[in-house]
Amino acid sequence: MSEYLQQIAKRRTFAIISHPDAGKTTITEKMLLFGNAIKTAGTVKAKKSGIHATSDWMEMEKQRGISITTSVMQFPYNGRIINLLDTPGHEDFSEDTYRTLTAVDSALMVVDAVKGVEDRTIKLMNVCRLRDTPIVTFMNKFDRDTRDPLELLDEVENILKIKCAPINWPIGMGKYFKGVYDLYNDEVTLFETGHGHEIYPYKKIKGLANAKDAIGIDLYEDLEMEIDLVRGASHEFDEQEFLEGNLTPVYFGTALSNFGVKEMMDGFTRYAPAPQHREADQRVVAADEQKLTGFVFKIQANMDEKHRNRIAFFRICSGKYEKGMKIFHERTGKQMQISKALTFMAGEREQVEEGYAGDIIGLHNHGSIQIGDSFTQGEKLKFKGIPNFAPEIFKRVKLNDPLKMKALQKGLVQLSEEGATQVFKPFISNDLVLGAVGVLQFDVVAQRLASEYNVKCSYEGVNVTLARWIFCNDEKKLNDFKKKYEVNLAYDGAGYLTYLAPTGVNLQLAQEKNPDIIFSATREH
């Protein structure tokens, strides 16, 4: 295999999906520890501690102590090059989180075993479903009193509609947690407390029967029964089913104590796919093609007054990036030279000399790049599957100075192109309605309008709870629909027709009465 093909085969690009506080920051940090990216754990402290996590970029993040941005961390592990895309887990996450999942080849789902499957996890899994993304699952916090592990598997299968194949099985929980049993290698790994900040060689015992003394007779007998039950009731791991997104291998452990993370990482790097082919409007692009192609899935604005630059996060789909090369910007039809692309290591920006399929690089953007833009070495290609997602929270924009209306409109359209918010102009009023997935997006927009466009605004409530993009092939039916429902209709910042529903019932009725109209929760960029 050539050096070029080896480089592609090494790449594993994934994101972690979880509900806030399920342990995502902790597990990220342990991965960096195993990848020698940090020397001791505890440097990516939870945000409450005052030591900021390595992925905090914006000032607002530091003030609020949450990770708004989707940063990228690259590190080596087991002969692989891991690209981990960090997704905000906080309540105030945004569409960026959803869109990041369009740039990965697989995902790690972290479940808080005390609480089970939670709301945010369900939403993120629905996004993974759009592309049948392969999922690995880590059941976290077994050093606490958790839910019954069989119950947890049932919940994942029933709520998330994915088959579970446990790879190992917990021995006890909480203060009686003794370790995990590997169902495929007949091996017990014994748990000890106090080793969370280091890579510790936990003791392993080959053969379940040989671990009887170490785990105690009561737990041993319970475990034997549970294993029989698990083997009978759960699914065998099947690599093809996993790659098709139908089945998830499940690992148990506690990220805080750095226990079970290595086993999960070993399994992940073994089974997770290398960079996959990507669909473009014109054709399918294979990862091992020689020419560079890729797309922008996120734009990171720097809130630092001194540096107004923005970074466009670019997923390489094929070919090799080399410093100083020229690329073709499909939307504008212009050539662009990349003199200083960035690579990301846990929040430190470094200039990158080369990149391969699966890698994420940062392009300096002075306003010409938008989310969803495709780049090639000359071919007209537009990658599919980088959607806008319907907002879930809406507010009306109130301008402090009415003379600044033009600047406000310009600012909002530009910020919507960047993915910071979505803007809607209703048919029957001069209002501007903003839509977002997370509350914090409204603060970000107000702050950026003030600093970049010199426009001060505030927000007030608006009678909208849901938005759906409207599509219809029959022009007459579409025109009839527009007349009948003009009170609910608006155009978004890019000029797409949108239905703004005051209630879920209102939307349901409109859908039932208009079977030929498509009400879509996503639209392509």
UniProtKB/Swiss-Prot annotation:
SUPFAM superfamilies: EF-G C-terminal domain-like (SSF54980), P-loop containing nucleoside triphosphate hydrolases (SSF52540), Translation proteins (SSF50447). The keyword S-adenosyl-L-methionine does not apply. It comes from the Bacteria. GO terms for molecular function: GTP binding; GTPase activity; guanosine tetraphosphate binding; translation release factor activity, codon nonspecific; translation release factor activity, codon specific. It holds the Pfam family GTP_EFTU. Gene3D superfamilies: P-loop containing nucleotide triphosphate hydrolases, Peptide chain release factor 3, domain III, Translation factors. Keywords: Cytoplasm, GTP-binding, Nucleotide-binding, Protein biosynthesis. PROSITE patterns: G_TR_1, G_TR_2. Its main location: cytoplasm. InterPro entries: EF-G-like_DII (IPR053905), EFG_III/V (IPR035647), G_TR_CS (IPR031157), P-loop_NTPase (IPR027417), PrfC (IPR004548), RF3_C (IPR032090), RF3_dom_3_sf (IPR038467), RF3_GTP-bd (IPR041732). The keyword Cell membrane does not apply. Increases the formation of ribosomal termination complexes and stimulates activities of RF-1 and RF-2. It binds guanine nucleotides and has strong preference for UGA stop codons. It may interact directly with the ribosome. The stimulation of RF-1 and RF-2 is significantly reduced by GTP and GDP, but not by GMP. PANTHER family: PEPTIDE CHAIN RELEASE FACTOR RF3 (PTHR43556:SF2). This is Peptide chain release factor 3. The gene is prfC.
